[in-house]
Amino acid sequence: MNSLWMGNLEPYMDEDFICRAFAQMGETVVKIRLIRDKITGKNAGYGFVELADDTAVERCLRKVNGKPLPGATPPKRFKLSRSNYGKQGESSTFSLFVSDLTPDVDDGMLYEFFHYHFSSCCSGKIVLDANGHSKCCGFVSFESEREQKRALVDLQGATGLGKKALRLSLASSRVNKKKESSENQIWQYHSDSKNASFINQYYYPQNLSYLSTYDWNYSLDYLNPSQNTTPVDVTQSEQTEDDDLEYPDSEINVTEANETFMAQSEELYSALIGCFFQPPESWDGVTCSASSYLPEPINQYEMEDSCSSNWVTT
């Protein structure tokens, strides 16, 4: 399309104002489409400018972009870029960050310098402060990743743009950042799922029957809110309903439990005591796996003899 995206517009800037501004820059506008606020009806700060051909688009990006906007109050600059209006999806671009620029370099000069060396350069943008003055740095975008990397090497320290040698570094476009962020989060979700499966396999007690019914090898395929929510065809996995799960009864009758414990203790004590009074003839074939640390019982007759002897002595 032979159109440009134009931003940095004030509410009073209408179609006639933009046509006059381009005419003073030596360009003829074919059509203008301003995006307006649905409530106030004023322009939303940006729009689309259609030119005669692609040559005019290239010329505006080189000669007009970044220049002062005629008749603008307060002072504004042309803010132009290639238009994606009417295209499906977002085009992927590869960017470089350019620093050590001088204040006289504008968007058009930045774009023209890099486009002269690499034809896939599609835009140049100077970073401005709140007052519209250059921060002496900017960004250039390429349609080819190969030429982006070549420019990083070939034009590192190059001169001819401003009064200083250029310093270049890689920069990620918003589209690539958004894609990379969503991929990293999906990877992180799957990684957390695998870690949870490993930990549950080796560190959770397996003798708890009420926990053994759960499947620890679950997958966390959550949708990141920042991702594109375009509907896609997916095969939904079967979900296990927990209506039939039995949960342990947490209520305990303490009194009844204590009585049961005491009764079992009395039975054990009686059984152990009874073992000492069994005649040796009944020990054949009998084994006992319980160990007793109770003191040996004193015979009743021995106790009476001991008491009698003590009384006589007295």
Swiss-Prot record:
Q: Where is the RRM domain?
A: 2-85, 94-173
Q: Which GO terms describe its molecular function?
A: mRNA binding
Q: Note the InterPro entries from the entry.
A: Nucleotide-bd_a/b_plait_sf, RBD_domain_sf, RRM_dom, TSAP1, TSAP1_C
Look up keyword RNA-binding and say if it applies.
yes
Query: Can you tell me which residues the record assigns to a coiled coil?
Result: none
Report if keyword Repeat is assigned. Answer: yes
Q: Which SMART domains match?
A: RRM
UniProt keyword annotations, A-Z = Cytoplasm, Nucleus, Protein biosynthesis, Repeat, RNA-binding
Leader sequence range is none
Tell where it localizes.
Nucleus; Cytoplasm
Question: What GO biological process terms are annotated to this protein in UniProt?
Answer: mRNA splice site recognition; translation
Pfam short name (any one): Trnau1ap
Cellular component (GO) terms are: cytosol; nucleus
Biological role stated in the UniProt entry? Involved in the early steps of selenocysteine biosynthesis and tRNA(Sec) charging to the later steps resulting in the cotranslational incorporation of selenocysteine into selenoproteins.
Indicate the family of this protein.
Belongs to the RRM TRSPAP family.
Listed name of the protein:
tRNA selenocysteine 1-associated protein 1
Q: Which organism is it from?
A: Danio rerio (Zebrafish)
